[in-house]
Amino acid sequence: MPKIIAFDEEARRGLERGMNQLADAVKVTLGPKGRNVVLEKKWGVPTITNDGVSIAKEIELEDPYEKIGAELVKEVAKKTNDVAGDGTTTATILAQALVREGLRNVAAGANPLGLKKGIEVAVERVSEELSKQAKEVETKEQIASTASISAGDSAIGGLIAEALDKVGKEGVVTVEESNTFGLELELTEGMRFDKGYISPYFVTDADRQEAVLDDPYILIVNSKIAAVKDLLPLLEKVMQTSKPLVIISEDVEGEALATLVVNKIRGTFKSVAVKAPGFGDRRKAILGDIAILTGGQVISEDVGLKLESTSLDLLGRARKIVVTKDETTVVEGSGDPDQIAGRVSQIRNEIDKSDSDYDREKLQERLAKLAGGVAVIKVGAATEVELKEKKHRIEDAVSNAKAAVEEGIVAGGGVALLQASITAFEKLDLSGDEATGANIVRLALEAPIKQIAFNSGLEGGVVVDKVRNLPTGHGLNAATGEYVDLIATGIIDPAKVTRSALQNAASIAGLFLTTEAVIADKPEKNPAPAVPGGGGEMDF
Protein backbone atom coordinates (compact mmCIF):
# COMPACT_ATOMS: atom_id res chain seq x y z
CA MET A 1 0.00 0.00 0.00
CA PRO A 2 1.42 3.47 -0.87
CA LYS A 3 2.49 5.70 2.03
CA ILE A 4 2.46 9.43 2.68
CA ILE A 5 5.13 11.15 4.76
CA ALA A 6 5.10 14.42 6.72
CA PHE A 7 8.17 16.05 8.30
CA ASP A 8 9.06 18.43 11.15
CA GLU A 9 6.41 20.97 12.12
CA GLU A 10 3.84 19.61 9.65
CA ALA A 11 4.18 16.11 11.16
CA ARG A 12 3.91 17.31 14.76
CA ARG A 13 0.97 19.64 14.04
CA GLY A 14 -0.91 16.81 12.29
CA LEU A 15 -0.48 14.61 15.35
CA GLU A 16 -1.51 17.49 17.62
CA ARG A 17 -4.75 18.08 15.70
CA GLY A 18 -5.73 14.43 16.20
CA MET A 19 -4.81 14.57 19.87
CA ASN A 20 -6.88 17.74 20.38
CA GLN A 21 -9.99 16.25 18.80
CA LEU A 22 -9.82 13.21 21.07
CA ALA A 23 -8.89 15.15 24.21
CA ASP A 24 -11.61 17.78 23.66
CA ALA A 25 -14.24 15.02 23.47
CA VAL A 26 -12.93 13.34 26.63
CA LYS A 27 -12.26 16.33 28.91
CA VAL A 28 -15.88 17.55 29.06
CA THR A 29 -16.55 14.59 31.41
CA LEU A 30 -14.13 15.64 34.18
CA GLY A 31 -15.31 16.60 37.67
CA PRO A 32 -18.61 16.47 39.57
CA LYS A 33 -20.26 18.74 36.98
CA GLY A 34 -18.73 17.01 33.95
CA ARG A 35 -21.04 16.14 31.06
CA ASN A 36 -21.74 12.84 29.31
CA VAL A 37 -20.79 11.77 25.79
CA VAL A 38 -23.09 9.72 23.53
CA LEU A 39 -21.43 6.93 21.53
CA GLU A 40 -23.20 5.60 18.43
CA LYS A 41 -23.20 1.82 18.02
CA LYS A 42 -23.60 0.05 14.68
CA TRP A 43 -26.01 -2.36 16.33
CA GLY A 44 -28.27 -1.74 19.30
CA VAL A 45 -28.86 1.38 21.32
CA PRO A 46 -26.26 4.17 21.72
CA THR A 47 -24.08 4.20 24.85
CA ILE A 48 -24.02 7.22 27.18
CA THR A 49 -20.85 7.43 29.27
CA ASN A 50 -18.46 9.73 31.12
CA ASP A 51 -15.62 7.17 31.12
CA GLY A 52 -12.55 8.58 29.37
CA VAL A 53 -11.17 5.33 27.98
CA SER A 54 -14.55 4.22 26.58
CA ILE A 55 -14.90 7.52 24.70
CA ALA A 56 -11.29 7.41 23.47
CA LYS A 57 -11.67 3.85 22.11
CA GLU A 58 -14.61 4.92 19.92
CA ILE A 59 -12.78 7.76 18.16
CA GLU A 60 -11.51 6.97 14.63
CA LEU A 61 -10.41 10.02 12.62
CA GLU A 62 -10.35 10.27 8.82
CA ASP A 63 -7.10 12.22 8.28
CA PRO A 64 -4.17 9.72 8.52
CA TYR A 65 -1.87 12.00 10.58
CA GLU A 66 -4.65 13.05 12.92
CA LYS A 67 -5.62 9.40 13.31
CA ILE A 68 -2.09 8.52 14.49
CA GLY A 69 -2.13 11.46 16.96
CA ALA A 70 -5.44 10.27 18.40
CA GLU A 71 -4.15 6.67 18.63
CA LEU A 72 -1.12 7.82 20.65
CA VAL A 73 -3.33 9.58 23.19
CA LYS A 74 -5.68 6.58 23.25
CA GLU A 75 -2.67 4.61 24.42
CA VAL A 76 -2.32 6.97 27.42
CA ALA A 77 -5.93 6.33 28.41
CA LYS A 78 -5.67 2.56 27.88
CA LYS A 79 -2.38 2.23 29.82
CA THR A 80 -3.73 4.28 32.74
CA ASN A 81 -6.89 2.18 32.74
CA ASP A 82 -4.87 -1.08 32.70
CA VAL A 83 -2.58 -0.02 35.55
CA ALA A 84 -4.95 1.90 37.81
CA GLY A 85 -8.46 1.21 36.47
CA ASP A 86 -9.41 4.89 36.36
CA GLY A 87 -7.90 8.37 35.82
CA THR A 88 -8.15 8.10 32.04
CA THR A 89 -9.68 11.56 31.59
CA THR A 90 -7.01 13.17 33.80
CA ALA A 91 -4.27 11.36 31.85
CA THR A 92 -5.68 12.59 28.52
CA ILE A 93 -5.93 16.20 29.76
CA LEU A 94 -2.35 16.11 31.10
CA ALA A 95 -1.06 14.63 27.81
CA GLN A 96 -2.80 17.38 25.82
CA ALA A 97 -1.40 20.13 28.07
CA LEU A 98 2.15 18.73 27.97
CA VAL A 99 2.13 18.31 24.17
CA ARG A 100 0.54 21.70 23.47
CA GLU A 101 3.03 23.60 25.65
CA GLY A 102 5.93 21.44 24.45
CA LEU A 103 5.21 21.97 20.74
CA ARG A 104 5.01 25.72 21.33
CA ASN A 105 8.55 25.61 22.72
CA VAL A 106 9.84 23.33 19.94
CA ALA A 107 8.44 25.78 17.35
CA ALA A 108 10.28 28.59 19.20
CA GLY A 109 13.59 26.73 18.76
CA ALA A 110 13.95 24.59 21.91
CA ASN A 111 15.73 21.23 21.63
CA PRO A 112 13.08 18.44 21.86
CA LEU A 113 15.48 16.03 23.61
CA GLY A 114 16.32 18.64 26.25
CA LEU A 115 12.61 19.28 26.82
CA LYS A 116 11.95 15.53 27.09
CA LYS A 117 14.70 15.13 29.69
CA GLY A 118 13.33 18.06 31.72
CA ILE A 119 9.80 16.63 31.57
CA GLU A 120 11.03 13.21 32.79
CA VAL A 121 12.98 14.68 35.74
CA ALA A 122 10.06 16.92 36.79
CA VAL A 123 7.51 14.08 36.56
CA GLU A 124 9.74 11.82 38.67
CA ARG A 125 9.99 14.50 41.40
CA VAL A 126 6.24 15.19 41.36
CA SER A 127 5.52 11.43 41.56
CA GLU A 128 7.80 11.16 44.62
CA GLU A 129 5.98 14.11 46.20
CA LEU A 130 2.59 12.48 45.52
CA SER A 131 3.78 9.31 47.28
CA LYS A 132 4.82 11.40 50.30
CA GLN A 133 1.45 13.17 50.35
CA ALA A 134 -0.50 9.89 50.16
CA LYS A 135 -2.36 8.85 53.29
CA GLU A 136 -3.19 5.22 53.99
CA VAL A 137 -6.83 4.25 53.73
CA GLU A 138 -7.85 3.61 57.32
CA THR A 139 -11.62 3.55 57.28
CA LYS A 140 -14.46 2.06 55.29
CA GLU A 141 -15.77 5.64 54.89
CA GLN A 142 -12.62 6.68 52.98
CA ILE A 143 -13.09 3.79 50.53
CA ALA A 144 -16.73 4.82 50.16
CA SER A 145 -15.71 8.45 49.47
CA THR A 146 -13.20 7.42 46.77
CA ALA A 147 -15.70 5.14 45.04
CA SER A 148 -18.51 7.73 45.38
CA ILE A 149 -16.45 10.41 43.60
CA SER A 150 -15.59 8.06 40.74
CA ALA A 151 -19.19 6.84 40.36
CA GLY A 152 -20.80 10.20 41.15
CA ASP A 153 -23.17 8.40 43.54
CA SER A 154 -22.80 7.91 47.31
CA ALA A 155 -25.04 4.80 47.34
CA ILE A 156 -22.72 3.06 44.87
CA GLY A 157 -19.68 4.17 46.90
CA GLY A 158 -21.15 2.72 50.09
CA LEU A 159 -21.93 -0.61 48.42
CA ILE A 160 -18.40 -0.91 46.97
CA ALA A 161 -16.87 -0.09 50.37
CA GLU A 162 -18.98 -2.84 51.95
CA ALA A 163 -17.95 -5.31 49.23
CA LEU A 164 -14.22 -4.56 49.64
CA ASP A 165 -14.56 -4.67 53.43
CA LYS A 166 -16.01 -8.18 53.17
CA VAL A 167 -13.67 -9.71 50.57
CA GLY A 168 -10.44 -8.01 51.70
CA LYS A 169 -7.55 -6.48 49.80
CA GLU A 170 -6.96 -9.53 47.59
CA GLY A 171 -10.65 -10.16 46.93
CA VAL A 172 -12.42 -9.75 43.64
CA VAL A 173 -15.41 -7.46 43.18
CA THR A 174 -17.22 -8.10 39.91
CA VAL A 175 -20.11 -6.16 38.38
CA GLU A 176 -22.95 -8.00 36.63
CA GLU A 177 -26.15 -6.92 34.89
CA SER A 178 -29.34 -7.86 36.69
CA ASN A 179 -32.98 -8.15 35.62
CA THR A 180 -34.16 -6.51 38.84
CA PHE A 181 -34.19 -2.75 39.46
CA GLY A 182 -31.50 -1.12 41.67
CA LEU A 183 -28.30 -2.48 43.23
CA GLU A 184 -27.66 -5.75 45.02
CA LEU A 185 -24.54 -7.17 46.70
CA GLU A 186 -23.88 -10.91 46.70
CA LEU A 187 -20.99 -12.33 48.74
CA THR A 188 -19.33 -15.73 48.39
CA GLU A 189 -18.15 -17.52 51.51
CA GLY A 190 -15.02 -19.60 50.85
CA MET A 191 -13.76 -20.74 47.44
CA ARG A 192 -16.38 -21.11 44.73
CA PHE A 193 -16.00 -22.52 41.23
CA ASP A 194 -18.46 -22.94 38.36
CA LYS A 195 -19.04 -26.69 38.31
CA GLY A 196 -21.85 -28.57 40.06
CA TYR A 197 -22.67 -32.19 40.88
CA ILE A 198 -22.37 -34.76 38.09
CA SER A 199 -25.61 -36.51 39.10
CA PRO A 200 -28.71 -35.06 40.84
CA TYR A 201 -28.82 -38.23 42.97
CA PHE A 202 -26.06 -36.68 45.12
CA VAL A 203 -28.48 -34.00 46.45
CA THR A 204 -28.89 -34.03 50.26
CA ASP A 205 -31.32 -31.08 50.53
CA ALA A 206 -34.20 -31.72 48.12
CA ASP A 207 -35.88 -28.33 48.72
CA ARG A 208 -32.78 -26.32 47.82
CA GLN A 209 -31.43 -28.92 45.37
CA GLU A 210 -28.04 -28.85 47.11
CA ALA A 211 -25.57 -31.44 48.33
CA VAL A 212 -24.22 -30.20 51.69
CA LEU A 213 -21.39 -32.25 53.21
CA ASP A 214 -19.96 -31.39 56.64
CA ASP A 215 -16.30 -32.08 57.45
CA PRO A 216 -15.72 -34.17 54.29
CA TYR A 217 -12.60 -35.73 52.81
CA ILE A 218 -11.78 -34.24 49.38
CA LEU A 219 -10.26 -36.36 46.61
CA ILE A 220 -8.68 -34.21 43.87
CA VAL A 221 -7.84 -36.09 40.65
CA ASN A 222 -6.48 -34.71 37.37
CA SER A 223 -8.03 -37.47 35.20
CA LYS A 224 -11.28 -39.33 34.54
CA ILE A 225 -12.49 -41.99 36.97
CA ALA A 226 -14.42 -44.82 35.34
CA ALA A 227 -13.26 -48.14 36.82
CA VAL A 228 -14.62 -48.86 40.30
CA LYS A 229 -11.62 -51.09 41.13
CA ASP A 230 -9.37 -47.99 41.11
CA LEU A 231 -11.67 -46.16 43.53
CA LEU A 232 -12.69 -49.04 45.83
CA PRO A 233 -9.58 -49.20 48.10
CA LEU A 234 -9.96 -45.49 48.94
CA LEU A 235 -13.75 -45.72 49.42
CA GLU A 236 -13.25 -48.48 52.02
CA LYS A 237 -10.71 -46.34 53.93
CA VAL A 238 -13.04 -43.30 53.94
CA MET A 239 -16.09 -45.38 54.97
CA GLN A 240 -14.22 -46.56 58.08
CA THR A 241 -13.92 -42.90 59.23
CA SER A 242 -17.71 -42.28 58.80
CA LYS A 243 -16.89 -39.06 56.95
CA PRO A 244 -18.42 -38.07 53.58
CA LEU A 245 -16.28 -37.87 50.44
CA VAL A 246 -16.14 -35.18 47.74
CA ILE A 247 -14.49 -36.16 44.45
CA ILE A 248 -13.24 -33.36 42.17
CA SER A 249 -11.94 -34.82 38.91
CA GLU A 250 -12.01 -34.37 35.13
CA ASP A 251 -15.07 -36.66 35.15
CA VAL A 252 -16.61 -39.59 37.02
CA GLU A 253 -18.50 -42.03 34.83
CA GLY A 254 -19.49 -45.65 34.28
CA GLU A 255 -19.41 -48.12 37.15
CA ALA A 256 -17.49 -45.71 39.42
CA LEU A 257 -20.34 -43.18 39.23
CA ALA A 258 -22.97 -45.93 39.58
CA THR A 259 -21.29 -47.26 42.76
CA LEU A 260 -21.24 -43.80 44.38
CA VAL A 261 -24.88 -43.12 43.46
CA VAL A 262 -26.15 -46.52 44.70
CA ASN A 263 -24.34 -46.15 48.04
CA LYS A 264 -25.72 -42.61 48.43
CA ILE A 265 -29.33 -43.71 47.71
CA ARG A 266 -29.06 -46.64 50.16
CA GLY A 267 -27.63 -44.33 52.81
CA THR A 268 -24.52 -46.52 53.15
CA PHE A 269 -22.07 -43.77 52.23
CA LYS A 270 -22.51 -40.06 51.59
CA SER A 271 -20.51 -38.63 48.68
CA VAL A 272 -20.68 -36.20 45.78
CA ALA A 273 -18.75 -36.13 42.49
CA VAL A 274 -17.93 -32.81 40.80
CA LYS A 275 -16.24 -32.07 37.47
CA ALA A 276 -13.02 -30.07 37.77
CA PRO A 277 -13.30 -26.45 36.55
CA GLY A 278 -11.40 -25.11 33.53
CA PHE A 279 -9.48 -26.87 30.76
CA GLY A 280 -5.89 -27.93 30.11
CA ASP A 281 -3.20 -26.08 32.05
CA ARG A 282 -5.75 -23.80 33.72
CA ARG A 283 -7.61 -26.84 35.11
CA LYS A 284 -4.33 -28.23 36.45
CA ALA A 285 -3.58 -24.89 38.14
CA ILE A 286 -7.06 -24.59 39.71
CA LEU A 287 -6.89 -28.17 41.04
CA GLY A 288 -3.52 -27.24 42.56
CA ASP A 289 -5.17 -24.22 44.24
CA ILE A 290 -7.96 -26.41 45.67
CA ALA A 291 -5.37 -28.91 46.94
CA ILE A 292 -3.34 -26.18 48.70
CA LEU A 293 -6.50 -24.62 50.17
CA THR A 294 -7.75 -27.94 51.58
CA GLY A 295 -4.38 -29.43 52.56
CA GLY A 296 -4.58 -32.27 50.03
CA GLN A 297 -2.64 -33.42 46.96
CA VAL A 298 -3.63 -33.57 43.30
CA ILE A 299 -3.65 -37.28 42.42
CA SER A 300 -1.93 -37.35 39.06
CA GLU A 301 0.40 -39.80 37.34
CA ASP A 302 2.54 -36.76 36.40
CA VAL A 303 3.75 -36.70 40.03
CA GLY A 304 3.75 -40.48 40.48
CA LEU A 305 0.47 -40.75 42.41
CA LYS A 306 -2.06 -43.43 41.42
CA LEU A 307 -5.72 -43.48 42.45
CA GLU A 308 -5.72 -47.12 43.58
CA SER A 309 -2.86 -46.52 46.05
CA THR A 310 -4.16 -43.19 47.44
CA SER A 311 -4.11 -42.92 51.25
CA LEU A 312 -6.23 -40.65 53.49
CA ASP A 313 -3.32 -38.27 54.17
CA LEU A 314 -3.35 -37.28 50.46
CA LEU A 315 -6.96 -36.11 50.69
CA GLY A 316 -8.00 -32.54 51.46
CA ARG A 317 -10.35 -31.48 54.27
CA ALA A 318 -12.82 -28.60 54.75
CA ARG A 319 -15.40 -27.58 57.35
CA LYS A 320 -18.17 -27.77 54.77
CA ILE A 321 -18.74 -28.19 51.03
CA VAL A 322 -21.93 -27.03 49.31
CA VAL A 323 -22.61 -28.28 45.77
CA THR A 324 -25.48 -27.08 43.57
CA LYS A 325 -26.35 -27.94 39.96
CA ASP A 326 -23.98 -25.24 38.67
CA GLU A 327 -21.38 -24.45 41.33
CA THR A 328 -19.35 -25.77 44.25
CA THR A 329 -18.30 -23.83 47.36
CA VAL A 330 -15.49 -24.98 49.68
CA VAL A 331 -15.86 -23.38 53.13
CA GLU A 332 -12.84 -23.17 55.48
CA GLY A 333 -10.34 -25.48 53.82
CA SER A 334 -7.78 -27.08 56.16
CA GLY A 335 -4.68 -26.05 54.17
CA ASP A 336 -1.41 -24.89 55.74
CA PRO A 337 -1.46 -21.03 55.93
CA ASP A 338 2.24 -20.88 54.91
CA GLN A 339 1.61 -22.98 51.80
CA ILE A 340 -1.43 -20.86 50.90
CA ALA A 341 0.67 -17.68 51.32
CA GLY A 342 3.36 -19.20 49.06
CA ARG A 343 0.78 -20.04 46.40
CA VAL A 344 -0.69 -16.51 46.63
CA SER A 345 2.79 -15.04 46.15
CA GLN A 346 3.38 -17.29 43.11
CA ILE A 347 0.08 -16.18 41.49
CA ARG A 348 0.95 -12.52 42.18
CA ASN A 349 4.25 -12.95 40.35
CA GLU A 350 2.41 -14.52 37.40
CA ILE A 351 0.02 -11.52 37.32
CA ASP A 352 2.98 -9.10 37.23
CA LYS A 353 4.63 -11.00 34.37
CA SER A 354 1.49 -11.59 32.29
CA ASP A 355 0.91 -9.30 29.30
CA SER A 356 -2.52 -10.73 28.44
CA ASP A 357 -5.59 -9.02 29.90
CA TYR A 358 -7.53 -12.30 29.82
CA ASP A 359 -4.79 -14.26 31.64
CA ARG A 360 -4.42 -11.47 34.21
CA GLU A 361 -8.16 -11.50 34.88
CA LYS A 362 -8.19 -15.30 35.36
CA LEU A 363 -5.12 -15.15 37.63
CA GLN A 364 -6.77 -12.37 39.66
CA GLU A 365 -9.84 -14.60 40.11
CA ARG A 366 -7.64 -17.47 41.33
CA LEU A 367 -5.88 -15.11 43.72
CA ALA A 368 -9.17 -13.86 45.14
CA LYS A 369 -10.48 -17.37 45.69
CA LEU A 370 -7.34 -18.32 47.61
CA ALA A 371 -6.60 -15.15 49.56
CA GLY A 372 -9.76 -13.10 49.73
CA GLY A 373 -13.26 -13.69 48.53
CA VAL A 374 -15.59 -12.81 45.71
CA ALA A 375 -18.32 -10.16 45.83
CA VAL A 376 -20.74 -9.59 42.96
CA ILE A 377 -22.51 -6.23 42.57
CA LYS A 378 -25.67 -6.76 40.53
CA VAL A 379 -26.87 -3.68 38.65
CA GLY A 380 -30.38 -3.09 37.36
CA ALA A 381 -31.91 -0.06 35.60
CA ALA A 382 -35.05 1.04 33.76
CA THR A 383 -33.47 1.01 30.28
CA GLU A 384 -30.56 -0.78 28.62
CA VAL A 385 -28.76 2.53 27.96
CA GLU A 386 -28.94 3.50 31.64
CA LEU A 387 -27.90 -0.01 32.70
CA LYS A 388 -24.72 0.03 30.59
CA GLU A 389 -23.81 3.56 31.73
CA LYS A 390 -24.34 2.62 35.39
CA LYS A 391 -22.34 -0.61 35.05
CA HIS A 392 -19.47 1.36 33.48
CA ARG A 393 -19.43 3.84 36.37
CA ILE A 394 -19.47 1.08 38.98
CA GLU A 395 -16.59 -0.81 37.31
CA ASP A 396 -14.50 2.39 37.33
CA ALA A 397 -15.41 3.07 40.95
CA VAL A 398 -14.39 -0.47 42.01
CA SER A 399 -10.98 -0.02 40.33
CA ASN A 400 -10.63 3.39 41.99
CA ALA A 401 -11.39 2.01 45.45
CA LYS A 402 -8.94 -0.89 45.02
CA ALA A 403 -6.22 1.54 43.88
CA ALA A 404 -6.87 3.66 47.01
CA VAL A 405 -6.41 0.63 49.27
CA GLU A 406 -3.18 -0.25 47.42
CA GLU A 407 -1.21 3.03 47.50
CA GLY A 408 -3.26 5.38 49.67
CA ILE A 409 -5.23 8.53 48.92
CA VAL A 410 -4.45 12.16 48.07
CA ALA A 411 -6.61 15.28 47.82
CA GLY A 412 -8.97 15.10 44.83
CA GLY A 413 -10.14 17.70 42.36
CA GLY A 414 -6.73 18.05 40.65
CA VAL A 415 -5.36 19.69 43.82
CA ALA A 416 -2.82 16.95 44.69
CA LEU A 417 -0.97 17.43 41.38
CA LEU A 418 -0.88 21.21 41.72
CA GLN A 419 0.30 21.19 45.34
CA ALA A 420 2.82 18.37 44.77
CA SER A 421 4.35 20.44 41.97
CA ILE A 422 4.85 23.46 44.27
CA THR A 423 7.02 21.41 46.67
CA ALA A 424 8.74 19.37 43.91
CA PHE A 425 9.84 22.42 41.90
CA GLU A 426 11.45 24.09 44.92
CA LYS A 427 14.11 21.34 44.87
CA LEU A 428 14.65 21.21 41.09
CA ASP A 429 17.94 22.59 39.77
CA LEU A 430 17.90 22.47 35.97
CA SER A 431 19.08 24.81 33.24
CA GLY A 432 18.48 25.54 29.55
CA ASP A 433 15.96 23.40 27.68
CA GLU A 434 15.72 20.94 30.59
CA ALA A 435 14.47 23.77 32.82
CA THR A 436 11.98 24.69 30.08
CA GLY A 437 10.81 21.04 30.00
CA ALA A 438 10.26 21.09 33.76
CA ASN A 439 8.31 24.33 33.41
CA ILE A 440 6.08 22.65 30.79
CA VAL A 441 5.17 20.07 33.47
CA ARG A 442 4.49 22.82 36.03
CA LEU A 443 2.04 24.51 33.65
CA ALA A 444 0.44 21.20 32.56
CA LEU A 445 -0.30 20.23 36.18
CA GLU A 446 -2.73 23.16 36.34
CA ALA A 447 -4.79 21.70 33.46
CA PRO A 448 -6.97 19.19 35.41
CA ILE A 449 -8.03 21.71 38.07
CA LYS A 450 -8.72 24.35 35.37
CA GLN A 451 -10.87 21.87 33.43
CA ILE A 452 -12.85 20.88 36.56
CA ALA A 453 -13.44 24.59 37.24
CA PHE A 454 -14.44 25.24 33.60
CA ASN A 455 -16.90 22.30 33.61
CA SER A 456 -18.40 23.79 36.80
CA GLY A 457 -18.83 27.25 35.22
CA LEU A 458 -15.88 28.85 37.10
CA GLU A 459 -12.76 30.65 35.87
CA GLY A 460 -9.84 28.17 35.92
CA GLY A 461 -7.01 30.70 36.35
CA VAL A 462 -8.69 32.29 39.40
CA VAL A 463 -9.22 28.87 41.01
CA VAL A 464 -5.57 27.85 40.45
CA ASP A 465 -4.26 31.09 42.03
CA LYS A 466 -6.53 30.60 45.04
CA VAL A 467 -5.56 26.91 45.55
CA ARG A 468 -1.82 27.72 45.33
CA ASN A 469 -2.14 29.81 48.49
CA LEU A 470 -4.19 27.28 50.49
CA PRO A 471 -2.72 24.74 52.97
CA THR A 472 -1.84 21.29 51.54
CA GLY A 473 -4.94 19.17 51.01
CA HIS A 474 -7.27 22.20 50.79
CA GLY A 475 -8.92 23.10 47.49
CA LEU A 476 -12.10 23.66 45.52
CA ASN A 477 -15.16 21.51 46.08
CA ALA A 478 -16.48 21.94 42.52
CA ALA A 479 -19.88 20.53 43.48
CA THR A 480 -20.55 23.43 45.90
CA GLY A 481 -18.05 26.08 44.73
CA GLU A 482 -16.51 26.26 48.25
CA TYR A 483 -12.84 25.96 49.25
CA VAL A 484 -12.51 23.23 51.90
CA ASP A 485 -10.21 20.60 53.43
CA LEU A 486 -10.71 18.04 50.65
CA ILE A 487 -9.51 14.94 52.52
CA ALA A 488 -11.69 15.73 55.55
CA THR A 489 -14.66 16.36 53.24
CA GLY A 490 -14.10 13.05 51.43
CA ILE A 491 -13.03 14.56 48.08
CA ILE A 492 -10.14 12.20 47.49
CA ASP A 493 -8.36 10.37 44.67
CA PRO A 494 -6.22 7.22 44.84
CA ALA A 495 -2.52 8.17 44.73
CA LYS A 496 -1.92 5.31 42.25
CA VAL A 497 -4.47 6.72 39.78
CA THR A 498 -3.06 10.26 39.97
CA ARG A 499 0.56 9.07 39.65
CA SER A 500 -0.19 6.69 36.74
CA ALA A 501 -2.09 9.41 34.86
CA LEU A 502 0.88 11.80 35.10
CA GLN A 503 3.56 9.23 34.21
CA ASN A 504 1.69 7.86 31.18
CA ALA A 505 0.86 11.36 29.91
CA ALA A 506 4.53 12.40 30.18
CA SER A 507 5.66 9.25 28.37
CA ILE A 508 3.51 9.97 25.31
CA ALA A 509 4.30 13.72 25.38
CA GLY A 510 8.02 12.91 25.10
CA LEU A 511 7.31 10.84 21.97
CA PHE A 512 5.25 13.65 20.42
CA LEU A 513 7.96 16.27 20.95
CA THR A 514 10.80 14.14 19.56
CA THR A 515 8.88 13.14 16.39
CA GLU A 516 10.49 14.41 13.16
CA ALA A 517 8.55 12.39 10.59
CA VAL A 518 5.21 10.61 10.37
CA ILE A 519 4.59 7.84 7.83
CA ALA A 520 0.96 6.90 7.22
CA ASP A 521 -1.09 4.85 4.77
CA LYS A 522 -2.27 6.90 1.81
CA PRO A 523 -6.08 7.18 1.96
CA GLU A 524 -7.80 5.25 -0.80
CA LYS A 525 -10.10 7.21 -3.09
CA ASN A 526 -13.32 5.25 -3.47
CA PRO A 527 -14.28 5.18 -7.18
CA ALA A 528 -17.78 6.40 -7.99
CA PRO A 529 -20.20 3.48 -8.40
CA ALA A 530 -20.87 2.53 -12.04
CA VAL A 531 -24.13 3.84 -13.48
CA PRO A 532 -26.38 0.88 -14.30
CA GLY A 533 -27.28 0.46 -17.99
CA GLY A 534 -30.71 1.49 -19.32
CA GLY A 535 -33.50 -1.04 -19.15
CA GLY A 536 -34.51 -0.74 -22.81
CA GLU A 537 -37.93 -1.99 -23.92
CA MET A 538 -38.76 -3.80 -20.70
CA ASP A 539 -42.36 -4.17 -19.61
CA PHE A 540 -43.16 -4.13 -15.94
Swiss-Prot record:
Keywords: ATP-binding, Chaperone, Cytoplasm, Isomerase, Nucleotide-binding. ATP binds at residues 29-32, 86-90, 413, 477-479, 493. It catalyses: ATP + H2O + a folded polypeptide = ADP + phosphate + an unfolded polypeptide. Pfam families: Cpn60_TCP1. It comes from the Bacteria. GO terms for molecular function: ATP binding; ATP-dependent protein folding chaperone; isomerase activity; unfolded protein binding. PANTHER family: 60 KDA HEAT SHOCK PROTEIN, MITOCHONDRIAL. Belongs to the chaperonin (HSP60) family. Forms a cylinder of 14 subunits composed of two heptameric rings stacked back-to-back. Interacts with the co-chaperonin GroES. Together with its co-chaperonin GroES, plays an essential role in assisting protein folding. The GroEL-GroES system forms a nano-cage that allows encapsulation of the non-native substrate proteins and provides a physical environment optimized to promote and accelerate protein folding. This is Chaperonin GroEL 4. The gene is groEL4.
